């Protein structure tokens, strides 16, 4: 029956608590060791009265159980990472082991009801001691301690932003997003185009302004010569021919003046008044 009961108990192992991790197991052992150190202390110490100085005593106490060779300053192998021969230098606790031990005890102290602000394993004196141990062992052993930093995986938002930026850089710009081209600069006026003179400084070629102001009409001139010839009793035929020729000459001058006005207006320049005199 007992054997059967033993078989039942072994078979019912599925209902047992899960096995603790390696970190949790080591933390329990470290906390038990520290509690034993407090009980063996003279005089015995209580956890509530423990300070950073007591933690330093505990760390120095653990050096006698260390397995790391730390060369002294006078040792011929000082600073040598791999000495070729043994030396009488003592064994110590490695800095990495002490740093991990303090971290586990600091967590265990708070798990057992300790206040975070009164945690002796987080005291400043303990941090300074660990820093001194790290520097001294690095020089004595010729090893540079460099804390490895974890590389955080990129978040989904940052990866999506990076992908969008890469897609925007590779894809051609859309016409709507592309800026409108600037308007072309105004073209210079060609050399053959003559600038227009200022307003009000050129002659207006209209026949009304020429007739009666600058030229004498042909009919008035003939009448004037006929009257003068009749009064003087001269040769009417001669004067009539002369006036007729003068009338014809006035018509030619009128045509020449009109042609000059048209040419001057096309050229865009002023016409001298001497043309009509």
Swiss-Prot record:
GO cellular component: nucleus
Chain intervals with Gly residues compositional bias: 1-16
Positions of short motif Nuclear localization signal: 147-151
The entry's keywords: Developmental protein, DNA-binding, Nucleus, Transcription, Transcription regulation
A GO term for molecular function: DNA binding
Recorded coiled-coil stretches: none
Gene Ontology BP term (one): mRNA transcription
Domain ALOG: 22-149
Compositional bias per record (Basic and acidic residues), positions renumbered to this chain: 19-28
Pfam families: ALOG_dom
Subcellular location: Nucleus
Top-rank taxon: Eukaryota
Main localization (coarse): nucleus
Residue spans of biased composition, Low complexity class: 154-177
InterPro entries: ALOG, ALOG_dom
Biased composition (Pro residues): 178-187
Region (Disordered): 1-28, 141-203, 225-245
Similarity remark: Belongs to the plant homeotic and developmental regulators ALOG protein family.
PANTHER family found in the cross-reference section: PROTEIN G1-LIKE2 (PTHR31165:SF121)
Function, in words: Probable transcription regulator that acts as a developmental regulator by promoting cell growth in response to light.
The protein, known as: Protein G1-like2
Lineage: Eukaryota, Viridiplantae, Streptophyta, Embryophyta, Tracheophyta
């Amino acid at each position: 029956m007992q054997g059967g009961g033993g078989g039942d108990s072994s078979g019912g192992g599925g209902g047992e608590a899960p096995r603790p991790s390696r970190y949790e197991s080591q933390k329990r052992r470290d906390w038990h060791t520290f509690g034993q150190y407090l009980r063996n202390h003279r005089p015995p110490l209580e956890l509530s009265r423990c300070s950073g100085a007591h933690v330093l005593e505990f760390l120095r106490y653990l050096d006698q159980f260390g397995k790391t060779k730390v060369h002294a300053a006078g040792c011929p192998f000082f600073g040598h990472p791999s000495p070729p021969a043994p030396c009488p230098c003592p064994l110590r606790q490695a800095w990495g082991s002490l740093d991990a031990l303090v971290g586990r005890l600091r967590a265990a102290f708070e798990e057992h009801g300790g206040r975070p602000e009164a945690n002796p394993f987080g005291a400043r004196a303990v941090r300074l001691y660990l820093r001194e141990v790290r520097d001294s062992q690095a020089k004595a052993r010729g090893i540079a301690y460099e804390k490895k930093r974890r590389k955080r995986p990129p978040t989904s938002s940052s990866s999506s932003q990076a992908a969008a930026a890469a897609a925007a850089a590779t894809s051609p710009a859309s016409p709507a997003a592309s800026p409108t081209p600037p308007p072309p600069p105004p073209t210079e006026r060609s050399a053959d185009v003559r600038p227009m003179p200022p307003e009000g400084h050129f002659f207006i070629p209209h026949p009304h302004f020429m007739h009666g102001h600058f030229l004498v009409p042909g009919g008035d001139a003939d009448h004037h010569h006929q009257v003068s010839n009749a009064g003087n009793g001269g040769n009417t035929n001669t004067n009539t021919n002369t006036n007729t020729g003068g009338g014809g000459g006035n018509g030619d001058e009128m045509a020449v003046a009109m042609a000059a006005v048209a040419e001057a207006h096309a050229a865009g320049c002023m016409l001298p008044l001497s043309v009509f005199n």
